[in-house]
Amino acid sequence: MATLGVNIDHIANVRQARKTVEPDPVQFAFLAELGGADSITVHLREDRRHIQDRDVFLLKETIKTKLNLEMAATEEMLEIAKKTLPDYVTLVPEKREEVTTEGGLDLKSNAQYLKNFVENLKHSNIEVSAFIDPLGEQINYSKEIGFDFIELHTGKYAELSGSEQYKELQRIIESTHLANDLGLVVNAGHGLNYNNVKKIASINNMNELNIGHSIVARALAIGLEKSVREMKSLITSN
């Protein structure tokens, strides 16, 4: 049965819109855990557009579940991860001009650099995941580089409908099976919401789904704890 990782970046987005101290994502992480979140995900971007360094450190000290730190593979982020010691790190591509992460890492073109980067994190006993598109080549490189997990990018699945969405779902299923055969733990995320999550959650050996925007959007209407409970129920009711 898949677990639920709640991404709280959008709480920080609201705070940073006014450059003030509220809403505090650390407080909302606590509410997400009350609602059943199995882990908390934050993306510390190089431009600090939402999550700030203090958020990461405070979350590590206060949350009761696990902390998943999404970050680019840079020396600055490596040092922050080694100081913070999150439960695991998910390496993601990053462009300053993007609104949100647009696609998976290209592991092939950065294989040696990423291998050294992953080894460095593992020396600090941090497990490492790669955010990748559901492609066989990228999954094979994930194993070769030494990642413990992969997170399959579900953005395309979320954007499509009908037969095209079905084809993308099959690609995600096949990618999950390939990764499992290679000994990789499989997470998934991006664009998942209350209407499309169940088919992804029902994939055999899917470990965790990382979801943020749809939960936060629904929380504006019904409250965060309840919105997390509803998503958790959808994931676990297979």
UniProtKB/Swiss-Prot annotation:
Site (Transition state stabilizer): E151
EC assignment: 2.6.99.2
Name of the top EC class for this enzyme: transferase
Keyword vocabulary terms for this entry: Cytoplasm, Pyridoxine biosynthesis, Transferase
Active-site residues, as the UniProt record annotates them: H43 (proton acceptor), E70 (proton acceptor), H190 (proton donor)
Keyword Transferase in record: yes
Residues engaged in binding 3-amino-2-oxopropyl phosphate: N7, R18, G191, G212, H213
Function description: Catalyzes the complicated ring closure reaction between the two acyclic compounds 1-deoxy-D-xylulose-5-phosphate (DXP) and 3-amino-2-oxopropyl phosphate (1-amino-acetone-3-phosphate or AAP) to form pyridoxine 5'-phosphate (PNP) and inorganic phosphate.
UniProt cross-references to PANTHER family, sorted A to Z: PYRIDOXINE 5'-PHOSPHATE SYNTHASE (PTHR30456:SF0)
UniProt protein name: Pyridoxine 5'-phosphate synthase
Lineage, top ranks: Bacteria, Bacillati, Cyanobacteriota, Cyanophyceae, Synechococcales
